[in-house]
A protein has these predicted regions:
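Conserved AMP-binding A3 loop
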Residues: 1-22
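Alpha-helix capping/helix-boundary segments
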Residues: 72, 93-95, 122
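Active-site phosphate/pyrophosphate- and oxyanion-stabilizing loops and adjacent acidic/basic residues
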Residues: 1, 25, 96, 128, ...
Length: 175
């Protein structure tokens, strides 16, 4: 994987195979990812989330991957309905776009099970709406680094305020 290059050129990141796999298997356990899941992948594969919590977690769990090069709310809503997508990660703006879409009610979103957000400030009201208006049974937020993997995350069952205002607790392997 590569860093974002916020202070210059992108840098490659060295990470042990053991650490990469532990991030992926922790993600599988935390979200309950399984071979029955259909994962709409909107996160880039060149950094931590897309690679470790996306591709590798899906391979470890046997989940079906549905890549999206660029998020488009109309295409995403149609794909959720057509493919029975169960896992939808993304920045808060993705959920805001879905919640505010004028045609949301015309799409069958009943298969959505896992929402994972982070990467930006999250308004509490947005997470309340995700809980109240979308069918997700698991809604979590996390914080991670390409260099280290998922450092902390909320867990299934945390309330909207916890999901929106914290990055949860340290994940296995972090202190």
């Amino acid at each position: 994987p590569f860093t974002s290059g916020t202070k210059g050129v992108h840098k490659s990141v060295v990470m042990t195979h053991g650490r990469i796999l532990s991030v992926a298997t922790d993600w599988v356990a935390m979200t309950g990812l399984s071979g029955n899941d259909r994962y709409l992948m909107v996160n880039p594969y060149f950094h931590m989330f897309g690679l470790k919590a996306g591709i590798l977690a899906s391979v470890a769990a046997g989940a079906t991957m549905y890549p999206e090069a660029v998020f488009d709310v109309d295409r995403a809503l149609a794909r959720v309905a057509a493919e029975g997508i169960t896992v939808l990660p993304g920045a808060p703006t993705i959920y805001q776009a879905i919640l505010d879409h004028p045609d949301r009610g015309t799409h069958d979103l009943s298969t959505l099970r896992v929402a994972v957000t982070g990467a930006a400030d999250i308004p509490v009201e947005l997470i309340r709406r995700v809980f109240d208006e979308l069918p997700f049974s698991v809604v979590v937020t996390g914080y991670g680094l390409t260099e280290a993997g998922t450092a902390s995350a909320t867990v299934p069952g945390d309330d909207a305020e916890t999901v929106a205002t914290t990055v949860g607790r340290p994940r296995p392997g972090f202190e």
